[in-house]
Swiss-Prot record:
Known role: Is required to sustain N(2)-dependent growth in the presence of low levels of carbon monoxide (CO). Probably acts by protecting the N(2) fixation ability of the nitrogenase complex, which is inactivated in the presence of CO.
GO BP term, example: nitrogen fixation
Family matches, as NCBIfam families: N2Fix_CO_CowN
Record organism: Allochromatium vinosum (strain ATCC 17899 / DSM 180 / NBRC 103801 / NCIMB 10441 / D) (Chromatium vinosum)
InterPro entries xref list: CowN
Statement: the UniProt record of this protein carries the keyword Cell membrane: no
Family: Belongs to the CowN family.
Domain of life: Bacteria
Keywords: Nitrogen fixation
Keyword Cell wall biogenesis/degradation tagged: no
Protein name from the UniProt record: N(2)-fixation sustaining protein CowN
């Protein structure tokens, strides 16, 4: 059976899930949004958060998991479909 045909279940194993990579990609999507010409009320908030992550060496997956609702609001505001899809995947597979 191919890897694609197997439903990934985080309660069995994290093998093949790549949660850290997914979290890094979500942070890239956040950067896309805050660099967009159309600013949102979330821009300054996430600029500070991204600075904190770097300064404090925080775990990216932890940050994404603890900010899910705020990240979702940012992505919805910007219509960032890729970011929303990644966020849903992280919630399902990693959190």
């Amino acid at each position: 059976m191919s890897q694609a045909a197997v439903k990934i279940d985080r309660y069995i194993t994290f093998e093949g899930i790549e949660c850290d990579e997914q979290a890094r990609r979500v942070l890239d999507c956040i950067r896309d949004c805050i660099e967009a010409p159309e600013a949102s009320s979330w821009s300054a908030y996430f600029e500070r958060k991204l600075d904190e992550i770097t300064r404090m060496g925080q775990d990216e997956l932890f940050v994404v998991g603890s900010q899910v609702n705020y990240i979702r609001a940012l992505f919805e505001h910007h219509g960032h479909r890729e970011g929303l899809d990644l966020l849903d995947r992280i919630e399902d597979e990693c959190c």
